[in-house]
């Protein structure tokens, strides 16, 4: 798909500001006033004169599309006017960093009505506050600089703006979906390039370098999260990030990695054989996980209850593990006992957007039901949301051993058969899915058919 055509226009910041304002008015009838947000400030590395890697504050970006550090924005709820404040020229820094973005350039680049410099912020706030009787200033706690003052505003609300942005971010517009799609295009190609290189390198770190280089060379300079490049049994560790172990003697590689496109994330996982050919045990587990993913995706559309889809994934896993003989007994009893959590301990997926684990979802990490404790999304899925579908099966001794020592669970686990699967490590397959009124759109194009992956690896 040609996402570039959609992305030729400006990021729809004012549309987002309207949605946020409408949410506030829905909660506070007749609400009036100003939304105030700050971009992330430049930060220095501790005990060093170099800057930390910059990552724009997502709340600010949602209402501006502006990637500049040390910037502010005001959105007038009544007039719908958005004013962006960017850093002025600092003559002392020009020799080192060059000229910054000018007000004229900023007005051309981003969906705002006026651009001023940050040294005008307090005077502008004072003028706006004095001209609006009984107006409220809406801001986010701990995201207001000490030098910024709201003295002229009769009322200040620090409780609803963050909530309003987090809720409205769940449903994406066409532009946002194109951003996630663009990140997926680049990252999918990077995943396939890693598959082509896997037989020709000796260490996980070399494959991480391949992925990063492909993303950066195609414009995805930042990663959405720390890449997981896990060979062999390391793939049973969900968030393994050492990425520094040799590949020799190991069966499979689990690659969980995704680049960003202008602050929007991709989150993709593929698992494939290091030598280009799945073992019998690895292929059996892969086929179960792929079935889990495909059948779960097939059920998705607006209004589907995510908890039910997660349950379906466990049912498919149980059926598959019973067929292999790893599990034994009645499948309904196994489901009720939650024994399948030993092999599939995490949730089926999470919302995706500007953050990898995006806002919304209503997770309940205190849930006493272990099958749902780590499910990051609960309840119905709205059209326009983007969610990952990432089932997995893992053979982690540390996790499974307590189940083997508990009669409640051990009665359903066939230890002699299980022992043949430890070297499989873990298998996870993850795609990024747009929920529509009648179905889905899969943004992830990286190959996942096991025969195709084997051919791709062999072709290199």
From Swiss-Prot:
Binding-site residues, Mn(2+) 2: 256, 267, 430
InterPro entries found in the cross-reference section: Aminopep_P_N (IPR007865), Creatin/AminoP/Spt16_N (IPR029149), Creatinase/aminopeptidase-like (IPR036005), Pept_M24 (IPR000994), X-Pro_dipept-like (IPR052433)
A single MF term (Gene Ontology): metalloaminopeptidase activity
GO biological process: proteolysis
Keyword terms of this UniProt record: Aminopeptidase, Hydrolase, Manganese, Metal-binding, Metalloprotease, Protease
SUPFAM superfamilies named among the record's database cross-references: Creatinase/aminopeptidase, Creatinase/prolidase N-terminal domain
Disulfide partners: none
Positions annotated to bind Mn(2+) 1: 267, 390, 430
Keyword presence, Nucleotide-binding: no
Matches recorded under Pfam families: AMP_N, Peptidase_M24
Cofactor binding summary note: Binds 2 manganese ions per subunit.
Keyword set includes Protease: yes
Cofactor(s) demanded: Mn(2+)
Gene3D superfamilies per the UniProt record, alphabetical: Creatinase/methionine aminopeptidase superfamily, Creatinase/prolidase N-terminal domain
Catalytic activity: Release of any N-terminal amino acid, including proline, that is linked to proline, even from a dipeptide or tripeptide
The organism's place on the tree of life at top rank: Eukaryota
EC number: 3.4.11.9
Entries under PANTHER family matching the protein: XAA-PRO AMINOPEPTIDASE 3, XAA-PRO DIPEPTIDASE
Function: Catalyzes the removal of a penultimate prolyl residue from the N-termini of peptides.
Family: Belongs to the peptidase M24B family.
Name recorded for this polypeptide: Probable Xaa-Pro aminopeptidase PEPP
């Amino acid at each position: 798909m040609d996402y570039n055509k959609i992305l030729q226009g400006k990021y729809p910041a004012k549309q987002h500001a309207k949605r946020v304002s409408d949410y506030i008015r829905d909660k506070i009838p007749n609400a009036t006033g100003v939304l105030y947000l700050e971009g992330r400030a430049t930060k220095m590395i501790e005990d060093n004169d170099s800057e930390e890697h910059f990552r724009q504050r997502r709340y600010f970006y949602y209402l501006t599309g502006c990637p500049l550090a040390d910037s502010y924005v005001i959105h007038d709820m009544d007039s719908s006017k958005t004013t962006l404040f960017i850093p002025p020229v600092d003559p002392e820094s020009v020799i080192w960093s060059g000229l910054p973005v000018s007000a004229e350039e900023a007005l051309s680049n981003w969906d705002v009505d006026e651009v001023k410099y940050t040294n005008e912020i307090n005077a502008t706030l004072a003028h706006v506050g004095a001209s609006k009787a009984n107006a409220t200033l809406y801001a986010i706690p701990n995201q207001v600089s000490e030098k910024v003052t709201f003295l002229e505003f009769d009322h200040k609300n620090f409780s609803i703006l963050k909530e309003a942005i987090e809720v409205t971010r769940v449903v994406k517009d066409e532009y946002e979906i194109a951003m996630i799609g663009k990140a997926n295009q680049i990252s999918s190609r990077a995943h396939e390039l890693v598959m082509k290189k896997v037989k020709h390198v000796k260490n996980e770190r070399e494959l991480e370098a391949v992925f990063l280089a492909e993303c950066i060379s195609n414009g995805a300079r930042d990663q959405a999260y720390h890449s997981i490049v896990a060979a062999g049994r390391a793939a049973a560790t969900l968030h393994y990030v050492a990425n520094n172990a040799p590949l020799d003697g190991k069966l499979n590689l689990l690659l969980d990695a995704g680049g960003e496109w202008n602050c929007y994330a991709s989150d993709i996982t593929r698992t494939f054989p290091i030598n280009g050919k799945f073992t019998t045990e690895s292929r059996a587990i892969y086929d179960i996980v792929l079935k889990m993913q495909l059948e779960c995706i097939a059920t998705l559309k607006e209004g589907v209850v995510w908890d039910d889809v997660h349950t379906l994934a466990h049912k498919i896993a149980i059926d598959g593990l019973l067929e292999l003989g790893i599990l034994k007994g009645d499948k309904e009893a196994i489901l009720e006992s939650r024994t399948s959590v030993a092999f599939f301990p995490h949730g089926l997926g999470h919302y995706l957007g500007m953050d990898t684990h995006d806002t919304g979802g209503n997770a309940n990490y205190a849930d006493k039901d272990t099958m749902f404790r780590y499910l990051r999304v609960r309840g119905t899925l709205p059209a326009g949301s983007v969610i990952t579908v990432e089932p997995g099966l893992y053979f982690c001794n540390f996790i499974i051993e307590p189940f083997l020592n508990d009669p409640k669970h051990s009665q359903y686990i066939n230890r002699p058969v299980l022992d043949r699967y430890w070297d499989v490590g873990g298998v996870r397959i993850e795609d990024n899915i747009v929920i529509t009124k009648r179905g889905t759109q899969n943004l992830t194009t990286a190959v996942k058919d096991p025969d195709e992956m084997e051919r791709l690896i062999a072709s290199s």
